Amino acid sequence: MTQPTPERASRRWLTVVRLPKAAWVFGASVVSMAILGAAAVILREPWVFPSLGPTAFLLFFAPGGPQSGARNVIAGHGIGVAAGVLALAMFGLLHTPVDLEDLSWQRAAAAVTCVGVTLGAMVLLNVPHAPAGATT
């Protein structure tokens, strides 16, 4: 029988230490996304969108982090939504149905504008929340 190497013992210890945190992040994110998913189904509104995954990770993995504060999360995503609506309106796409297959110059310009406005506004207002850049 081989003796455990210090590296292997160290990895085992780290796994034991990380397990409760991993379980917390898993459970809290599943519950929070399930609540939003249920609200989306009941209200027939898109309450679940891709940038919420990284937001949930920040909130549950590093709740005291600079990007995890309620102000940054709410303001960041709010800026992303507002920038998205503004960009769609600027390029005449506000009342156009969603189209994930046909990219036009208008859609590309709206996306570029939206991301730029979102990121710039978060810096200007000092509410950095990286996942909000994907809310656009």
Regions found by a protein language model. Name each.
Residues 48-53, 129-135:
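Transmembrane helix boundary and interhelical junction motifs in multipass membrane proteins
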Residues 78, 124, 130-131:
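Alpha-helical architecture
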Residues 1-96, 102-112, 118-121:
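Alpha-helical transmembrane segments and their membrane-interface boundaries
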Residues 88, 122-126, 135-136:
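Generic transmembrane alpha-helix signature in multi-pass membrane proteins
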